[in-house]
A protein has these predicted regions:
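Short acidic, Gly/Ser-rich segments with clustered Asp/Glu that frequently serve as metal-coordination loops
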Residues: 12-16
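Short, glycine-rich nucleotide/cofactor-binding loops
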Residues: 17-24, 104-109
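A short alpha/beta connector and helix-capping loop motif
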Residues: 19-46
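N-terminal nucleotide-binding beta1-loop-alpha1 segment
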Residues: 6-10
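Short, well-ordered beta-to-alpha junction loops that form the rim of enzyme active sites
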Residues: 49-50, 108
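Active-site-adjacent betaalpha module
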Residues: 2-4, 31-40, 55-179
């Protein structure tokens, strides 16, 4: 079997909600993650949210995948309407066609779409790795982004997903793709 990298909802409208310095650092990390995945032959699958809020309506500028990390020709984009990227989408079919049984997950928003997709992937029997510094969110509920991300790592770690920093991703992907 094989692994795939999921890039969830890194769309212009969501990226623009991050502080400019955080947005730049996040995009830079994602660029390196994408380079590592592609260098090891790991397929990259994008997920794009369609719908509310208004900025994510299909065809609007905010709906587009951020150009800095845009898919290469042939890399699939799965359109979704719910937090869980598997719900009422063709994601399971795309992953099945690719022979994937392990997912490396990146994207936005940590406590919403990333969390829901990681949990559903694990429930469906995928081995799941969350790339520790390749997911982001906006501050909310009196919590900073770092507090939200750290909490998600504590909740998901080991029981649901491995947590791996992007600096160790290439080696992890190389091991999986050479099996």
């Amino acid at each position: 079997m094989a692994a795939a990298l999921l890039v969830i909802d890194v769309q212009r409208a969501l990226l623009d909600e991050l502080a400019p310095d955080r947005s730049a650092a996040f995009v830079d990390t994602l660029k390196h993650v994408l380079e590592d995945a592609r260098a090891t032959g790991c397929p990259v699958v994008y997920v794009r949210h369609d719908g509310s809020p208004y900025e994510l309506l299909p065809g609007t500028p905010g709906w587009e995948v951020a150009t800095e990390i845009a898919p290469l020709p042939g890399e699939p984009i799965v359109e979704k309407r719910f937090r869980d990227a598997f719900r009422e989408t063709n994601l399971a079919d795309v992953l099945s066609t690719l022979g994937v049984d392990e997912l490396f997950v990146s994207g936005m928003q940590t406590e919403f779409c990333v969390d829901a997709t990681v949990r559903e992937a694990e429930r469906r029997g995928f081995r799941v790795t969350l790339v520790e510094d390749a997911h982001a969110t906006s501050p909310g509920g009196g919590l900073t982004e770092e507090q939200i991300r750290s909490h998600m790592h504590r909740v998901l770690r080991d029981e649901i997903a491995r947590i791996v920093p992007s600096g160790e991703l290439f080696e992890s992907l190389r091991k999986v793709t050479s099996e």
